[in-house]
Amino acid sequence: MSMRKIYLISDTHFNHANIIKYCNRPFSNVEEMNKTLIKNWNNVVRDKDIVYFLGDLILSKNKAKKARELLELLNGEIVFIRGNHDKFGEKFRVIEYNGYKFMLIHNPDSSYTLNFDGWIIHGHHHANHLDEYPFINPKRKSINVSVEVINYKPVSLDLIVKLIEKGKVVRTINDL
């Protein structure tokens, strides 16, 4: 039987029209963006997999209802870390995987990260500050899983571990 995989993703901003322009997303409208994000997610994640969602799921009226409807459409067991646009989820979580310690948090500049000695996996910065917050930053020990950086689909923790072991900066997943 195949193992459950662990995936990470942040900042989908479902239903948020302005994010398309603000973050230069390759979609012509919200419907196309929502459909593509759902399809990409479900092409990668199986029902038994775990997805750590690091904040900013959806921006819309009737947010709670819309979020519930949206979650029905997404594969996997989803663990929420609260983003700056969310009212639910843990503030952060620390996990160990393959001998590494990871803090999962929305904003890497949060005071929670100050004395943490492992790797910080975060969102929040989208692809707006890639020099400081690229996909993989060995110097800062940070990993940016905002959708714009990981090509709009969840990224596996196995791939992240492989990349941090190489010790090189990776600006976006498209640079691999």
Curated annotation (Swiss-Prot):
GO MF terms held by the record: hydrolase activity
Record field: transmembrane: none
Signal peptide segment: none
Pfam families the record matches: Metallophos
Coiled-coil region: none
Superkingdom per UniProt: Archaea
Protein name according to UniProt: Uncharacterized protein MJ1445
Biological classification of the source: Archaea, Methanobacteriati, Methanobacteriota, Methanomada group, Methanococci
Record InterPro entries: Calcineurin-like_PHP_ApaH, Metallo-depent_PP-like
